[in-house]
Amino acid sequence: MKYIIIGGVAGGATAAARLRRVDEKSDILLFEKGKYISYANCGLPYYIGGVIAEREKLLVQTPTFFGQRFRVDVRVENEVIAIHPKDKTITVRTADGREYEETYDKLLLSPGATPVRPPLEGIDSEGIFTLRNVEDTDHIKSYLTENSVKRSVVVGAGFIGLEMAENLHHAGVAVSVVEMGNQVMAPIDFSMAAPVHQHLIQKGVSLYLEEGVTHFQRTEQGITVFLKSGKTIPADMVLLSIGVRPATALAKQAGLKIGEAGGIWVNEYLETSAKDIYAVGDAIEYPHPLTGEPWLNYLANPANRQGRIVADNMVFGNKVAYEGAIGTSIAKVFDMTVASTGLAAKRLKQWEMEYQSSVTHSSSHAGYYPDALPLTLKLTFHPVTGKLYGAQGIGYEGVDKRIDQIAGLIKRGGTVYDLMETEHTYAPPFSSAKDPIAIAGYVASNIISGAMPVVTWRELVQHKNEVMLIDTRTAEEFSFGTIPGAINIPLDDLRERMLEVPTDKPIVLFCAVGLRGYLAQRILMGNGYKNVRNLSGGYKLYSAAVAPVPVPSIAAASVDARVTFGSTETSGTVVQSDSILSAGGSSKEPLKINACGLQCPGPIMQVKKAMDTLEPGEQVEIVATDAGFARDASAWCDTTGNRLVGSHEDKGRYTVVIEKGNSNMVCPSSTGTVAAGRGKTLILFSDDLDKALATFVLANGAAATGQKVTIFFTFWGLNVIKKLHKPETEKDIFGKMFGMMLPSSSKKLKLSKMSMGGIGGKMMRYIMNKKGIDSLESLRQQALENGVEFIACQMSMDVM
């Protein structure tokens, strides 16, 4: 028997080795038009960036060694230019142009895929590259070295594009990424890509989304990249990572069937439409196990599995069926890990498949064990049966093992209930007693059962004006930022403030990550509320999804863009610069606090406690893993008169340095925040509803800027703070008369104008509730939580 294999690397080389292991006597010929038959193509970007220092480590097997070990006739720089299925022959062209023919009994096609290179003006200019093989790698590496490249543009934000962006950055080159879509990494959903956008920008990458390249121009100064918006980006080098397409030219020449998706058609045994000709790898298409539709899957793992299967079928006959691939992939994007498996929500929409999704925020391991890092999982599943369709994960540690575990369940037709029953190894350094995938299963099962109806961030954006939006976080968290239109009823206050929640309007609850929103939802549903939904993924997901991507400036596209807020980045290590430590009025070392593993508002509460122990001018340095901490710290400084000295992120850890202000220091913020130490006193002597509302709005606004606020209630103003359920007290005849004539509580206050016997006040409250405006009672509670001091006039109380 004589086997011929066209193409090496994952599919072809794997098949050749397996063929020899199961058939010692047959002839095996391996043809490769390049110089290399087996190399780590997924490691190429890391060699360019210097992470992999030795080029030889990329070469898994040299042609000579492979040929000797497996007794395979390896012919590199021999390109097969034609296949003749009827004659069972191939035509080969050598590097020097000579052509010859070889016969075969069975043939395997493993030609791979070719990079997309659109016919744009200037695309063939010097300094514009694609990355697909070792030869491409050598060209890019030498160009970087010989031309002292300082600026680069990566066109395309897929896996290879972002890996190249990271490695060029690692090599000291400033990077701009241009992507035609509205997100990076097309296999994942937009909401999961949004945190990746933020991470790239934090690392100094200039990100151009929804931008296309129109043409390139080479000048003496370098390459100018022209965008469809009219913007231009100067560069010394351009890397095209627009995508790949199946290499089907040889198959078409041979008359083989090309499938609907554009790849070589194969049956379940990986045999093409021509007898005794098989195909594997990036060039083939195959039905997706979940949709049944043909698709192209450009991943190394399926190609290796196909290589083993096809070798057995070529030797023993068509007995081993290929079950297909669901598309399980992972990428390192600077410090972040991004992984996915199965079908994302947007793919399910594309195939018009009914689905539901869940988003959960967990930690890489037990939160109380040091250095627990955030880990977010998104599941897609059937809304009735719970059958798993897909999963996506982003985080810094432990993402891979969770997605791998879920992928195995999907391949076996598993459901969200299987996630709940999955056993996992547990010790605090590695996981939690309830693993993130178990938590994801619990949440998904609650959605299916109706225990937790959810609304997605996108649905909320579309219908926000039709619902009452309640933020169940603490008042302090609420003050750092919330969804526009939301009112704040902290979870622990909900039972006492339930009268503020209308029964005739759709309610959407949310918190930071979803748990408190769910608990609030159960309280309301347990008290008869029907139309109550929890925001999937919480404010953390919503704020990331709706946050605009900053428009890059050309000036920002420099190596110095990596240095932010006085920190210096060197080979992935962040070193605190002297400028941060000496910028304040104190020479003392900052008080250091480790808040890693704490969720909001934990880190900011730690800051507040620390600041209470410091003198003006002294600093606190706090490290947290909550991704929103740096934003919250900035808002906290703006409202308290303290100074944000600097912040930076490294491997999922956010370090913030804050200097305590004093009465003589004004926070140098563009918001014009007044320094802490100044105070306001408001006197409320009216019990008119509108005047009381105005008083509390002013009080809360002043308190939010860090000022000490006091409200002095006198005469009729005392009615504003009357308790709804008052204790029994002894009163004389005049006290009882006042009690009957005056409002019994703040709920009974009237308007100063157009009261209409109390109807005006009720109308005002109805309109406020409908528009999601805080009630008087809500504003009063917020004032107490913000530290506003209430003083009741003793004389007035004695008289009344």
Please give the residue ranges for each predicted region.
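Glycine-rich dinucleotide-binding loop and its adjacent helix/turn
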Residues: 109-171, 206, 260, 266-268, ...
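Rossmann-like dinucleotide-binding cores of NAD(P)H-dependent redox enzymes
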Residues: 59, 151-152, 159-217, 297-303, ...
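A Rossmann-like FAD-binding core segment of flavoenzymes
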Residues: 75-94, 102, 169-266, 565-568
